[in-house]
């Protein structure tokens, strides 16, 4: 988890800054030495200044930050922090045979409404820990 966070820190402090916009478990590769690397930069965007705002809706719904869900989204690198948190949620379940994910069983509209209105539905990850 720390390696993913440091990878995002590197992207966000790089000049110019890179916003990944699709951080999720399937975009994290682990090599033979157990080192995690962020991959798939197909949706990444370069920010030319710290004041610039990105305005396009991309990414995978279950990992998207709420800033992305407005008709005219305006966001920055913080969307990667939300996505990383969802990825960490998944990683914390490595020992469970049946993994549950935030917003499991909800369609896209229900996920949008739950997150936007802060009616978060947690999948009970803590119950077996």
Model-based region annotation:
Residues 6-18:
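Protein kinase catalytic-loop region centered on the HRD/HxD motif
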Residues 15-30:
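Catalytic-loop of the protein kinase fold
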Residues 54-68:
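Conserved activation segment of eukaryotic-like protein kinases, specifically the C-terminal portion
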Residues 67-78:
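Conserved end of the kinase activation segment
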Residues 96-129:
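C-terminal lobe of the eukaryotic/viral protein kinase catalytic domain
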């Amino acid at each position: 988890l720390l390696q993913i966070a440091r990878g995002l820190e590197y992207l966000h402090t790089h000049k110019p800054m890179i916003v990944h916009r699709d951080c999720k478990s399937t975009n994290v590769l682990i090599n033979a030495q157990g080192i995690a690397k962020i991959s798939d930069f197909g949706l990444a965007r370069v920010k030319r200044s710290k004041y610039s705002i990105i305005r396009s809706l991309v990414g995978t719904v279950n990992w998207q930050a709420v800033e992305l869900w407005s008709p005219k989204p305006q966001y920055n690198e913080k969307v990667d922090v939300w996505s990383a948190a969802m990825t960490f949620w998944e990683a914390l379940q490595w020992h469970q045979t049946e993994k549950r994910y935030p917003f499991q069983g909800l369609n896209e509209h229900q996920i949008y409404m739950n997150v936007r209105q802060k009616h978060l539905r947690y999948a009970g990850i803590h119950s077996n820990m």
